[in-house]
Amino acid sequence: MLYFIVNEKSKSGNAKQIWKEIEEVLKVRNVSYQAFVSEYRGHAGKLAAEICAMDDNDICLVAVGGDGTANEVINGITDFEKVRFGVIPTGSANDLARGLLLSKDPKNGAIHILNAMKKSREDTWCMDLGEVNFGEEKRLFAISAGIGLDALVCKKALKSTIKDILNKIRLGKLTYLVLTVQSLFTMQTADAEIFFDREEGLQKKRMIFTAAMNFKAEGGGVPMAPAASACDGKLSFCEAAGIPKWRTFLCLPFLVAAKHTSIHGFSVTDAKDCTIRLSRPMVVHADGEYCGEVTEVHFHCLPGKLRVLK
């Protein structure tokens, strides 16, 4: 059975009209489906859990919304064996859809999902997921998770008027760039000890950020880990540490152009697991969703966890 979880408020409310266009495609093709509207933060995850509890062994579950909605839905899935997941992007960043090379046109996206449903479960493409553990809590992520600057930007974006303004003039992707510049010079860094795949710890002074990447890009298309793959059983960890903030600022154009990996102070490491211990609390995020502030965090990869309709 085909189920939709729709966030009509994404992209400053434009998603409501987009959902109407998707429904037209479904009606023309006489497709049987059920749709549920996410009404508040966290609701999409609850809806996903309720759908998973239904007596249905082949659930095709589609998130209509931004990256945050998709993350909620994925975290709400209670049985990955009977779920095939799809996404029709209506957000401002849409990094998951970009990483999956999905159509930007919602009607084409719906048609593509309907065609993908014709494949058997065994032939459906599988992607890795990441899991971040912080304190007594944990959260799955499809795109990225991280601590420091990128997480601080995600926290600010949740309540930013800049994001709403830029979305209205169709420049929502710039939100993260504007907030990055704004946050860089005011944030506090932390010294860190990093353990990749449980090996000996690496000492990092004045860490600005560490991003655990499943796909190449986050934050509206910034290629933090240009060689990352969502089906290699590993995460790519992009770090910036031990360099002045002003130099980090000057390196931002290289970061956007995916030319940062050879610059002093930046590094990218592929690993299945990573534990980071910090000298002071730093903000942590998962797929742009604020998760709090921590002094220790653990990331690990869940290979082939999610079947994707693509």
Which residues fall in each region the model found?
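Glycine-rich phosphate/pyrophosphate-binding beta-alpha loops
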Residues: 146, 150, 209-225
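Short glycine/serine/threonine-rich phosphate/pyrophosphate-binding segments
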Residues: 44, 68-73, 95-96, 127
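ATP/NTP phosphate-donor binding region
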Residues: 1-61, 71, 75, 111-112
